[in-house]
């Protein structure tokens, strides 16, 4: 009798879980990774912190919104006949928390900083901050205003403005490329598949796009999207990073190769 009683209890609990929408247990099932939104900031490489300290804080204030950002200039070595180019970096979801420079303590900023310094490229890097409760799409006009201000103040070459984004920032990147296909010479977007975009606009900007192998439910779905982009005329470099999960792919996406892809446009 006790055996039947416990079987009855187990069946009741199981039905209760199904009624609440809980997924059944599957051995080996990989729980979904939270790609966007707020999440605790992880411990970062000390070198990333040192790089972040070399950036200068600034802000663009309007009656609607105050856009805070960090910026850094890089001096040209050799040929100084060209105007400086501009890199705009959109941070991930965790960057919306906090008030310090934690959100630029990232592999993207560090790798870009090291490359521009070693190569002696005349450039500026700017990293705006998206505040909690907003998305890059909702504050995009303020990002554009920031870019216009920097172009005027630092004599930026408007034909060489590059967009970079990680995770939540890459989702913002797809939105900005959809809104302003005329603005960016090229873009690198890491660890956020295109979901909401305007195809005929996005394909006008060359894109270097990466995803971690273990950050995809079905790789073939992503490849199908890339084929659609290319059929519509896109110049897109798509790389699956072997064996990497979401967080690993966010950090390892940025390389000399990806930066050189941007700079050749």
Residue ranges, per PLM feature:
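C-terminal catalytic histidine-bearing segment of alpha/beta-hydrolase fold enzymes
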Residues: 22-35, 39, 198, 206-210, ...
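Sec-dependent N-terminal signal peptides
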Residues: 4-13
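A domain-start/cap signature at the N-terminus of enzymes
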Residues: 19-85, 166, 225-227, 236
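Primarily recognizes the serine-hydrolase "nucleophile elbow" in alpha/beta-hydrolase
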Residues: 148, 152-153, 159-204
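Loop/turn elements at helix/coil->beta-strand transitions in domains of secreted/extracellular proteins
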Residues: 82-86, 120-124, 157-161, 180-186, ...
């Amino acid at each position: 009798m006790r055996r039947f009683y416990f079987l009855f209890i187990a069946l009741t609990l199981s039905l209760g879980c199904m009624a609440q929408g809980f997924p059944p247990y599957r051995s080996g099932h990989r729980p979904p990774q939270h790609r966007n939104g707020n999440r605790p900031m992880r411990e970062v490489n000390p070198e990333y912190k040192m790089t972040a300290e070399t950036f200068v804080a600034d802000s663009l204030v309007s009656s609607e919104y105050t856009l805070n950002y960090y910026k850094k200039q890089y001096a040209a070595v050799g040929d100084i006949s060209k105007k400086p180019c501009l890199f705009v970096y959109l941070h991930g979801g965790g960057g919306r928390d906090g008030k310090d420079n934690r959100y630029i303590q990232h592999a993207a900023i560090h790798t870009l900083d090291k490359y521009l310094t070693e190569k002696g490229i005349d450039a500026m890097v700017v990293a705006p901050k998206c505040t909690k409760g907003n998305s890059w799409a909702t504050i995009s006009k303020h990002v554009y205003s920031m870019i216009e201000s920097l172009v005027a103040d630092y004599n930026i070459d408007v034909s060489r403005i590059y967009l970079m984004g990680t995770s939540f920032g890459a989702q913002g990147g797809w939105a900005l490329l959809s809104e302003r296909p005329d603005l960016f010479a090229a873009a690198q977007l890491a660890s956020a598949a295109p979901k909401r975009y305007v195809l005929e606009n996005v394909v006008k900007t060359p894109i270097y796009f990466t995803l971690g192998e273990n950050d995809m439910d079905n790789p073939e779905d992503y490849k199908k999207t890339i084929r659609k982009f290319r059929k519509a005329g896109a110049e897109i470099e798509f790389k699956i990073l072997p064996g990497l999960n979401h967080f690993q792919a966010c950090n390892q996406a940025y390389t000399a190769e990806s930066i050189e892809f941007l700079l050749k446009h």
